[in-house]
Amino acid sequence: MNILLIIGSLHPGIGNNANLISKLIPFLAAEHSVRVLSFTGKTDRAKLPEAFCGAPVRWCVDDRTDLKRRFTYPAIGKLIDRHGASDALQRRLLRDEAAGFRREYPFDAVISTIQPFPCADTAAHLPGVRRLLYLMDPPAVICGRVSTSYRDRSLGKVLAAQDRIVTTPFIADALLSSEIPISREKLIVVGFPMVDKPIPPTRRQDDGRIRLLFCGWLYSDIRSPKYFLDILSRLDERFTVTFMGRECEKLTERFDVRTKAELITIPQQPYETALQAMADSDIMINIGNSVPVHMPSKTLEYINTGKPFVNFYKMDDCPTLYYTKRYPLCLNLSEKDPDIGAAAERFIEFCVSNKGKTVDRAYIEREYADCTPGYIANKILEALSM
């Protein structure tokens, strides 16, 4: 079977959806041909990677994908986005590129991601192929860039065109209870493909410090660190707290951070560097989202390490709890708890008593089997072969 992956966010950095797909490619390519179609704004073609996780990449390059940046006034660019004009240009470019690519590579099946949206829309309009949508972001996330009416109208058409949709249990429930007509039989419910062989930690002598790590993207709205920062203000000199990821280097500019702990802020790093930082930390920090059914995939990356971590959740039905309540070395702290002092005491006691502990690997692989790349890839291949 010839499989085409239509994914964005491969250049200049790899986005979350592309990172998730990267876990599956080795399993998809074990017995099948896999190629990638992706797009980027105006750039030097010589700098574009020729392959992604071993799969050859066909690039769609055009500066029109950055239409809104041509305007002096940001408000005009935002208005263009809200009515889908930027998406429309990207769709046109991708559709033309896919049609031309098909003459060179006669693909039988197409797997696309929902973000960026033109990837899924392009796949939905390719005739005579099996179509599978990899839907790991809830529809509400798209609403941040476009109007609700445009999102619902476009999303309904894209979902209807798919043969199967791979998604999380939370998004599946949200879709089935929404006004978008979709059958349960079309859905393949899995976790994030993050339970894989973990990176071993760097060997070092124990100096008595407790190293905490937040790794990920800091948002001021949907993933605000404010509650954790309130606890951070109560930590002493034993702790080293590292924030690593997008926007983390601006932490002290955006928030009032006061602590006796050693504080380190690091901008977004290559994925392998982030994984090594997780392996070398003592306790990790997970901050849940305020958007319903939107779960940080980092939650399962933390679980995969086998190390202790603290999960801050903003909603009683936060999807992180589905996984963290089963994890023996996780402290779940609700951000609705007004008693910061008591929460800080629980936090400190958890860190001190669990430093150096790990969860049995066999337990993780058994309890989170639906989050392994091999399991998910097999589900996808079964669906594409029907």
Regions found by a protein language model. Give the residues of each.
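Membrane-proximal helix-turn-helix segments that form the acceptor-binding/catalytic region
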Residues: L24, P118, T148-T167
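Catalytic binding pocket for nucleotide-activated donors in carbohydrate/polymer assembly enzymes
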Residues: A279-D370
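Nucleotide-activated donor-binding/catalytic signature segment of Leloir-type glycosyltransferases, i.e.
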Residues: G245, L251-T273
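An aromatic- and histidine-rich active-site surface loop
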Residues: D44, D87-R95, V110-G128
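Nucleotide-sugar donor phosphate/pyrophosphate-binding loop at the beta->alpha transition
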Residues: P139-V158, D196, D221-I222
